[in-house]
């Protein structure tokens, strides 16, 4: 073969390539748009599946990505109304989980037989109950096989000024405070003050978002503990009605 033949073939190939028409930019744009729409549609379907299952936080995550990456897609336009709903519901779901996590539940065996069940949560803010600084205040509902049902506050420091009975003020959400009977038993086992009408308090908590209890302390005056009660799982204390 002539030594010049490969060079001639290469030159011919290059010439043919040079003669090939350039790719239409509109075709490339259309291809990318189609690919983007396909990807957006897949995200929209994931979004709609999460909405159908009421998984609002998952739905919002899909909607966030879809509207950020493909804001002008048909899929984004289709889910727009549902996406706005998902954003609101996701915030509600997050708040519901936060409120539920404030409560703690215990079930303990009792030596004499049966089980003691309790539901408890701490006040929203620490309170100075003894003049020595802010401390925790806890609200507890207890169901004991021998002692029955009771509701009470427990102080981490200081003491209640309610020996022999007193009136505390109970405020429910935005309603005006009302007096309720309470008592501090003569015991050193725990610094506890019982709300006498535990059934009333339980029913109040079940239907409230926030309650505030103003109580007298030995350090002087009164203190107010605010409890975010909206996340109570009433099924954890099945004996309470």
PLM features per residue range, with description:
Residues 20-68, 74-241:
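A generic "folded-domain core" signal
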Residues 1-9:
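Bacterial N-terminal signal peptides that target proteins for export
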Residues 15-18:
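C-terminal motif of bacterial Sec signal peptides marking the signal peptidase cleavage site
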């Amino acid at each position: 073969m002539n030594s010049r033949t490969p060079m001639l073939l290469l030159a011919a190939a290059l010439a043919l390539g040079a003669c090939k028409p350039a790719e239409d930019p509109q075709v490339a744009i259309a291809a990318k748009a189609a690919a983007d729409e396909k990807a957006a549609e897949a995200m929209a379907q994931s979004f709609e599946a999460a909405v159908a299952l009421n998984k609002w936080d998952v739905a919002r995550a899909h909607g966030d990505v879809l509207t950020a990456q493909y804001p002008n897609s048909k899929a984004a336009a289709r889910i727009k109304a549902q996406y706005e709903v998902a954003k609101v519901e996701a915030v509600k779901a997050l708040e519901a989980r936060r409120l539920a996590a404030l409560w703690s539940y215990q079930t303990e065996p009792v030596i004499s037989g049966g089980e003691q069940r309790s539901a408890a949560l701490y006040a929203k803010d620490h309170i100075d109950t003894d003049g020595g600084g802010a401390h925790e205040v806890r609200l507890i509902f207890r169901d004991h096989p021998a002692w029955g049902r009771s509701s009470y506050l427990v102080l981490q420091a200081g003491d209640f000024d309610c020996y022999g009975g007193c009136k505390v003020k109970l405020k429910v959400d935005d309603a005006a405070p009302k007096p309720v009977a309470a008592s501090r038993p003569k015991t050193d086992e725990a610094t506890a003050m019982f709300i006498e009408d535990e059934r009333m308090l339980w029913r109040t908590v079940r239907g409230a978002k926030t309650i505030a209890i103003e109580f007298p302390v030995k350090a002087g005056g009164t203190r107010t503990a605010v409890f975010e009660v909206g996340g109570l799982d009433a099924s954890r204390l099945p004996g309470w009605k």
